[in-house]
A protein has these predicted regions:
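Short, amphipathic, aromatic/basic-enriched membrane-interface segments that mark the entry/exit
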Residues: 1-4, 41-42, 97-98, 386-392, ...
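Hydrophobic transmembrane alpha-helices of multi-pass small-molecule transporters
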Residues: 1-71, 198-200, 211-212, 228-362, ...
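Hydrophobic, membrane-inserted alpha-helices
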Residues: 11-17, 109-113, 146, 203, ...
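Transmembrane helix-bundle signature of multi-pass membrane transporters/permeases
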Residues: 33-34, 110-116, 130, 147-158, ...
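Membrane-embedded alpha-helical segments and adjacent helix-loop junctions characteristic
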Residues: 45-146, 333-441
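Transmembrane alpha-helical segments in integral membrane proteins
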Residues: 72-93, 201-218, 321-335
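Short helical (or helix-break) motifs at transmembrane helix termini and adjacent helical loops
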Residues: 125-134, 458-473
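Membrane-core helix-loop-helix motifs of multi-pass transport proteins
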Residues: 134-232, 246-258, 471-528
Length: 549
């Protein structure tokens, strides 16, 4: 048995429903995991509890997971030191004088997010740490900051030629049946497919329009109105106090450089360790015995794309913490006792996010894994529904986009969706183009748009899902209540997904990138004109009802 069929849908649906009903993400995730374990165990409560324990322990026993877990905790320690010394406050005050208004601070956050493209976790937490005080100064809602962070994480990483995401996609593409018939390298395939990644590119366009034209709608408009009228950066009545917010010290000793230096160190160390990890892994003790030989054995591009980002980020935060610790002591911004308190408070502030992250990994495992590995095999079940259906080539991109979005949203992982969908869709797309007798360029367009539909759907699901680790870390980086981030981002993500779906339908019909983008821009322009007006009209109607005698 490869899957549990429709039963696999229960855990993600239950988790998402409970999260919005109870406003308690941790309890909702726990009950979602438990429901999956009960299904896997055939209703046996003792076996379900044992499976639950194995899942939670397995999430932290995984080497990649534990390094990301430690990176997040130690980044919290760094943030604690930045706050304790007053460096974050000093930098925020300095930047607030340079960035005169909300538009400037949001655009600076957007640009910073584009620059830090090497890893989505690194992006969300680092950019959030730096830009949060500046956006707070200009009363930018935390939900808006979280949206910008989330939208410049996965959507940007999937477009960057050198990132932890690209190596994953290229490795799956390279090993997929039918790819060899295209006669191109995996990297060439990735580069040529970028224009077809409608969701990621439209998300970037959406951010710019929201920032410069202030075309907010839905729940985000309410967050903006709350910040403008009351100065509150999140709805404390609904979501309470944020436990991850670290109070900043009021001090005149810290300078803007005291904030910039640790962040620059983190970026430099991360960039340095990305290829270094590949070189270290290449040392086999026989043909390659040292770093110099390892570096000479591969190009810098190969070193970047074949690295293990979890090692690179973990080493980067360790070295950054050590240098920053000594630097602050030398600057007399804190003593040994204060440094210890800062590290402790910083790690403590990350505990809620770390618990949620562990739960998200666990529910992803029970949903994604096959029954032989103690999971439900939901992705396999959904993909089989498509494979068993009979449909023409033109509708394939739209179906693939929708299915990838559902899988990624339900499982909270885009990478898992890549692994499930690309090996299935590649041979289907190549086979259908061969059967249709398409010319080479048209056949290439068909394959590009089908695989880009997988990438776009997976990124949407990861972008919008409340159980996605990148969504969780964007909330953490912005110090925004997680459910407020989900509620405010969802309408934007769904709108961009609708634009992309229109593009994939049109692109599938004409097998042409220009027709796809024409459809995207028509739907996007119409929506950005109408949706803000609908939100204002709805708010006015509700206000009128409330004040009717």
């Amino acid at each position: 048995m490869d899957h549990f069929g429709m039963w696999g849908i229960i855990p993600p649906v239950l988790t998402i429903a409970l999260a919005f009903i109870t406003k308690d993400v941790i309890v909702s995730l726990f009950l979602g995991i438990l429901s999956g374990c009960i299904i896997v165990a055939g209703g046996n409560p003792a076996a379900a509890l044992m499976r639950l324990t194995d899942l939670l322990a397995g999430s932290l026993a995984d080497g990649w997971n534990i390094r990301i877990f430690l990176f997040c905790g130690l980044l919290g320690a760094l943030v604690g030191m930045l706050s304790k010394t007053g460096a974050a406050q000093a930098f925020g005050l300095w930047m607030s004088k340079k960035l005169k208004n909300k538009t400037a601070s949001q655009f600076a956050t957007f640009i910073f997010g584009l620059i830090v493209f090497i890893d989505d976790y690194f992006n969300s937490l680092t950019v959030g740490t730096v830009m949060r005080p500046i956006n707070d100064q200009h009363k930018v809602p935390r939900a808006k900051l979280a949206y910008i962070l989330d939208s410049t994480a996965a959507p940007v990483c999937i477009l960057a030629p050198v990132s932890s995401w690209v190596v994953t996609v290229m490795s799956i593409v390279r090993n997929s049946e039918g790819f060899g018939k295209l006669g191109m390298s995996d990297f060439e395939f990735f580069i040529r497919a970028i224009p077809y990644n409608l969701y990621a590119l439209t998300t970037i366009l959406m951010i710019l329009v929201i920032i410069f034209f202030k075309s907010d709608f839905g729940a985000m408009k309410k967050s903006e109105d709350l910040a403008r009228t009351s100065g509150l950066l999140w709805n404390e009545e609904v979501y309470g106090v944020i436990s991850g917010d670290i109070p900043e010290e009021q001090t005149t000793r810290a300078k803007p450089l005291d904030m910039l230096l640790p962040i620059l160190l983190l970026i430099v160390f991360a960039i340095a360790f990305f290829p270094a990890v590949s070189w270290i892994n290449a040392i086999d003790g026989t043909t390659i015995t040292n770093i110099s030989q390892a570096a000479a054995s591969m190009s810098i591009r190969d070193a970047f794309i074949n690295t293990d980002s979890s090692y690179a980020l973990f080493y980067a935060i360790i070295f950054t913490l050590a240098v920053t610790y000594l630097y602050y002591l030398a600057r007399r911004l804190m003593n040994l006792k204060e440094a210890s308190e800062a590290v402790r408070d910083g790690i403590k502030s990350m505990v809620p996010a770390l618990i949620i992250l562990t739960m998200a990994w666990s529910i992803g495992a029970v949903i994604r894994s096959s029954p032989t590995d103690g999971g439900l095999g939901l992705g396999r079940y959904l993909s089989e529904l498509v494979v068993s259906s009979s449909f023409p080539l033109w509708i394939l991109p739209a179906i693939v986009f929708a299915l990838s979005a559902v899988i990624a949203f339900a499982t909270g992982t885009s990478w898992g969706t890549f692994g499930i969908m690309i090996p299935i869709i590649m041979p289907i797309a190549v086979g259908l183009t061969e059967n249709a007798g398409l010319a080479q360029n048209t056949a290439f367009n068909a394959v590009f748009i089908c695989i880009s539909a997988v990438l776009g759907g997976a990124v949407f699901g990861d972008h919008a899902s409340p159980i996605s680790d990148t969504t969780i870390l964007s909330s953490t980086g912005a110090a925004c209540p997680h459910l407020e981030h989900v509620a405010t981002q969802m309408p934007y993500a769904l709108f961009v997904a609708s634009c992309s779906l229109a593009g994939f339908i049109t692109g599938g019909i004409f097998m042409n990138i220009l027709s796809a983008w024409l459809a995207v821009l028509v739907v996007f322009t119409s929506g950005m004109i109408l949706l803000p007006k609908i939100t204002v009209a709805k708010a006015g109607s509700e206000y009128g009802c409330l004040n009717t005698p």
